[in-house]
Amino acid sequence: SGKWWNDAFEAIGYDNAFQIKVLPDGAHPMDVRYNMIHWVHRATRGWSYGGAVVDPRTGEIIKGNVSLGSLRLRQDYLIATGLMAPYTDQNIVPSAMRELALARIRQLVAHEIGHTIGIQHNFLASTFDRASVMDYPHPTLNLSSDNELEWKNAYDVGIGEWDMLAVEYGYQDFPKGTDEELALEEIIQKGIQSGMTFITCLLYTSDAADE
């Protein structure tokens, strides 16, 4: 699911630039040449994180680090248990429970990778259908004609329209002589005209920018 971001970079002209591979044998996870996804076991509940090593002089992202806790899968499995209530006298795990949990993990991987490339939460993305993996999604369920829950589209697959826009804004190269400030404003206006909105958990003010 981390490769979902490749769609956004290909859209602005970077073919196959965003790749995910198994760490080479003998490589150290702290080697700055490698962006890392760490699968971490915890004995207690913990958050997943997406962070980066950044050059403070230029803002360049040098290395991305994602940490995914093992208990998140258990949490998602319990959500599925609560929704499906598969309680019988047999120890059978419905495949839909497993698929629901794995679908959420795939979405989470893309979310945390989004942070490593500089993209913040967008807690308004859910007001524009499924516009971003950078929101905190709940499972979207439907009722069938016989009043059974349908799980097929509980979580989305792929990044959303807002994610595509954010990558375009942050990474698009412009031809020499382009008024970049105007070009970036046009990207913002394109999103607004499409109905996309943005709110995050960080506060930016003009005073903070001046400091």
Locations of regions flagged by a protein language model:
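Catalytic Zn2+-binding segment of zinc metalloproteases
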Residues: 115-126
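Conserved catalytic/binding loops enriched for acidic/polar residues
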Residues: 126-206, 211
